Amino acid sequence: DKPAEREDYSYQKQVDWMTDWLIANNFKNLTFFGQDWGGLIGLRMVANEPSRFDKVSMGNTGLPYNPEAPKEVLEKIKEFRESSLKLTPMSMAKEISEMDGKSLSQEDTEFHPALKFMYWQKFCWDTVDLPTGLLMTNMMEKNSRLNSAAYYLFVSLGLGKYFPFKSDVAKAYEAPFPDPSYKMGPRAMPSHVPTIPDQSLEAQRKAREVFKNWDKPFLSVFAGDDPVTNGIERDVLSMCPNAKSAPHIGGGHFYQWTRPKELSNLLINFINT
């Protein structure tokens, strides 16, 4: 029930599908909230159909726009993606943690965040049987070191599906993928995050122009302790001058899971005011 080819997946296709869904259902007077891809795709959808939305809120996401990435950064990313380096979940996670607080617009080529995010992109694409359960439980739950180490060992041996002590979260995130052929989406989509200039550049510019002139309520709700997106919040507030920033609530990247009550209360107050 999932497209099986890499070419089936792109940022633009996801935006088109969601915009078509929005129009087909004729939804109006909406309050939007997006996180992660929900923001990258959803904010573009909002920009396509702004009259359907009364309020916008988002967090741990953004509309990356980096038209002038340093040439040295582009060359390093290209070389890295084509390399034979084999990444593990642990080695990838270490590099991603060092993205913290950095902005795509910075000129420091040694510490440019795209040079860290490329580890996530390469890991996902090169790993045919992406360990979705292991990745998600590590980001969303507090597991014992013994359990995490044992799960990692099973995955390393190609036996991840046989690990007997999976949490319900791990099982839930593995359930949509009966075998590796179903995992093309999570493998392919990270490479479409526009941390460097790509085919989405002009569409990103146009969407950001909508939010530059946005005159309706816009709430930025970031966790504040997510190394992947901490550096994006400043860009969001700059992109939308009308945006207000909510207090950081913690909880890491998937804070809608780890801080559901705190996030819900912020959004309920935003909707009701």
Regions inferred by a protein language model and the residue ranges of each:
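Flexible "cap/lid" subdomain of the alpha/beta-hydrolase fold that forms the substrate-access gate
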Residues: 1-33, 37-243
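C-terminal alpha-helix
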Residues: 266-273
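Catalytic histidine-centered segment of alpha/beta-hydrolase-like enzymes
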Residues: 251-264
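Catalytic histidine neighborhood in serine/cysteine hydrolases
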Residues: 239-253
